[in-house]
UniProtKB/Swiss-Prot annotation:
Disulfide bonds: none annotated. The gene is gloB. It catalyses: an S-(2-hydroxyacyl)glutathione + H2O = a 2-hydroxy carboxylate + glutathione + H(+). Coiled coil: none annotated. Binds 2 metal ions per subunit; upon overexpression in E.coli the enzyme purifies with various amounts of iron, zinc and manganese. The endogenous metal is unknown. This is Hydroxyacylglutathione hydrolase. The lineage of its organism: Bacteria, Pseudomonadati, Pseudomonadota, Gammaproteobacteria, Enterobacterales. Thiolesterase that catalyzes the hydrolysis of S-D-lactoyl-glutathione to form glutathione and D-lactic acid. It comes from the Bacteria. Pathway: Secondary metabolite metabolism; methylglyoxal degradation; (R)-lactate from methylglyoxal: step 2/2. Its EC number is 3.1.2.6. A divalent metal cation 2 binds at residues 57-58, 127, 165. Transmembrane segments: none annotated.
Length: 251
């Protein structure tokens, strides 16, 4: 299996997973034009689309792609049924695409019906987890998003986080505003800044490394707890997550 990315809009990535025969699955195609261009250039044969949630920048290209490739199966949660999904999927479902088994996780928070697709090592997590951050809570609660992130955090160390936006630099700047002396975050900031100066992507990221630099995965970390305690005493990791998310919303 080979992982490919197609830039879209201002900061989206449309992921394309291909096998040795050139058959492919397209993840969250927010627009069709760059996908069609890549398909023509690489002579890919689209077999399926994975949708993580219903937002337009993740589903906007589905109907046009289906006009070109009507044989494709479009998998998505119930909230994408009117966005082009042909096969509805949910928590605990397994599907076989490109000869590989993918497991579905419900990850509510960003939207109520958000799902992730996992076939080791690839995790297509849409707008749930970003490098250094997590999605805004447009529909779900902090508790829901926290539990969703803990599902992801329980995956194997070598999991490749294939999220949908290039938000890494801004997220790491936020992390440094909370833990300015953290050695892992500072090292990652230098690396990410260098990549972005060269207009190179920072994704995908390995979960093992993400646990070190993403504050939203470190709500039981003593350094973070001590920093939060300077402002407010929060006993539960879910409450610390909510505090962080609130801070990020206004950063």
């Amino acid at each position: 299996m080979n992982l490919n990315s197609i830039p879209a809009f201002q900061d989206n990535y449309i992921w394309v997973l291909t096998n040795d025969e050139g058959r492919c699955v397209i993840v969250d195609p927010g627009e069709a034009a760059p996908v069609l261009k890549a398909i023509a250039e690489h002579k890919w044969m689209p077999e399926a689309i994975f949708l993580t949630h219903h937002h337009h920048d993740h589903v906007g290209g589905v109907k046009e792609l289906l006009q070109h490739f009507p044989q494709m199966t479009v998998y998505g949660p119930a909230e994408t049924q009117d966005k082009g999904a042909t096969h509805l999927v949910g928590d605990g479902d397994t599907i076989r695409v490109l000869g590989e088994k993918f497991t579905l996780f419900a990850t509510p928070g960003h939207t109520l019906g958000h799902v992730c697709y996992f076939s080791r090592p690839y995790l297509f997590c849409g707008d749930t987890l970003f490098s250094g951050g997590c999605g805004r809570l447009f529909e779900g609660t902090p508790s829901q998003m926290y539990q969703s992130l803990m599902k992801i955090n329980s995956l194997p160390d070598d999991t490749l986080i294939c999220c949908a936006h290039e938000y890494t630099l801004a997220n790491i700047k936020f992390a440094l505003s909370i833990l300015p002396h953290d050695s892992f975050i500072n090292e990652y900031y230098r690396k990410v800044k260098e990549l972005r100066v060269k207009k190179q992507m920072t994704l995908p990221v390995i979960l093992k490394n993400e646990r070190k630099i993403n504050l939203f995965l470190r709500t039981e970390d003593i350094d973070l707890i001590n920093e939060i305690n300077k402002e407010t005493i929060l006993q539960q990791p879910e409450a610390r997550f909510a505090w962080l998310r609130s801070k990020k919303d206004t950063f």
